[in-house]
């Protein structure tokens, strides 16, 4: 049931074209704000992640630093995504039309939950997809930490939807 509600929220947000119509500068600014919050709270997040997955605190803090770098990297790409013509033969036309897919359903593995989570969110964010993301059942706390950061920087409701559960049930749905 929760997965259905999350999907409906993501679909509503996508249909409102919140990310699709957000200009590149605003997308970039929000992603950089997420990166900044991740850096500011890396020690707190690192301790939480260490408690839930058993890695050293240093490894976990480094994972949060890497996640911040991921958001910064994709923030720099927001104004590089464009529709364009591709050179081709004299009697053909070859072009790329970039458009968002809709709702992206993502399942995060347990081994690098913060790093992989950030990549999944950032990649979908820049192209305008909304996201339903299922974190690993073995590492649920770090995804709640992420959720708080998204709220703190003002990510619009429905853009990123975190759903906990077991892969056998939630992931299959």
PLM regions and their residue ranges:
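Glycine-rich loop-to-alpha-helix module at the N-terminal edge of alpha/beta enzyme cores
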Residues: 1-81
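Rossmann-like NAD(P) dinucleotide-binding subdomain of oxidoreductase/dehydrogenase enzymes
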Residues: 50, 82-173
């Amino acid at each position: 049931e929760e997965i259905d509600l999350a999907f409906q929220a993501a679909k509503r947000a996508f249909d409102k074209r919140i990310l699709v119509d957000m200009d590149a500068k605003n997308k970039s600014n929000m992603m950089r704000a997420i990166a900044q919050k991740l850096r500011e709270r890396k020690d707190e997040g690192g301790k939480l992640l260490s408690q839930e997955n058993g890695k050293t605190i240093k490894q976990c803090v480094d994972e949060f630093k890497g996640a911040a770098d991921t958001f910064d990297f994709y923030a720099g790409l927001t104004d590089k995504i464009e529709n364009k013509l591709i050179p081709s033969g004299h009697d053909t036309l070859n072009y790329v039309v970039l458009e968002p897919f809709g709702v992206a359903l993502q399942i995060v593995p347990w081994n690098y939950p913060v790093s992989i989570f950030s990549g999944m969110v950032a990649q979908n964010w820049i192209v305008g997809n909304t996201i339903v993301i299922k974190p690993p059942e073995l590492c649920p706390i770090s995804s709640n930490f992420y959720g708080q950061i998204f709220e703190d920087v003002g990510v619009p409701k429905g853009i990123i939807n975190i759903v906990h559960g077991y892969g056998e049930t939630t992931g299959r749905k």
